[in-house]
């Protein structure tokens, strides 16, 4: 509830710390400020409608959302290929389905795909090829390559939305991270049916930002926190108790 919000974050800060940038600890951000991040949403028109529907509506529930994603693989992948092929620059292309990865690999001539069925050696070889610039475009899934990799040579990311803000955050941060010298563009490709997925992803992003901001605020003022109700008076009880 609203009246307990501040005490809650004060309690969290008694056992947790949050740091996003040097200024969160009172230092200067000058040498840490990242280039601008440009996030673009591209709404793709589906070529077919769900059974029994006269026009496109946002999918309701996970079942309908999965069906929407599988039904629009061709249209969404074509949009990503158009965005990536038009630049001639390195691009990091994220997908979630095997069908998406295979379609993208066919549509982007100079791309390499890292899939779950690849051997560890093959994965390493292809990831290194992209990192070293021998492959212009890398296609993979967040659960495979969204953690622990540095691709600062690339400043173009495409993403199919999901309900996981963590996946989106980590996927973007492979390129938009310390050491990146150019503005980073993220093209989010979706359909009318996935409006609900996008809204949920945006809500989680806003909540995550609010959480970090509040944690940093309370963390920095923690030294001034005092207990408001400190019951130090001994209770008076009858002598016969």
Where are these regions (language model features)?
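Interdomain linker/hinge connecting the two RecA-like lobes of the SF2 helicase core
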Residues: 1-91, 95-107, 204-228, 237-240
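Hydrophobic residues at beta-strand termini and immediately following loops
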Residues: 42-45, 113-116, 189
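Short, solvent-exposed loop/turn segments at secondary-structure junctions
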Residues: 47-49, 97-101, 119, 144-145, ...
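Alpha-helical elements of the RecA-like P-loop NTPase motor core of helicases
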Residues: 78, 102, 124, 149, ...
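Conserved helicase ATPase core of P-loop NTP-dependent helicases/translocases
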Residues: 92-94, 101-105, 109-145
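Short, well-ordered beta-strand core segments
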Residues: 138, 156-158, 175
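A short beta-strand element within the Helicase C-terminal
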Residues: 149-162, 184-188
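A conserved SF2-helicase RecA2
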Residues: 163-241
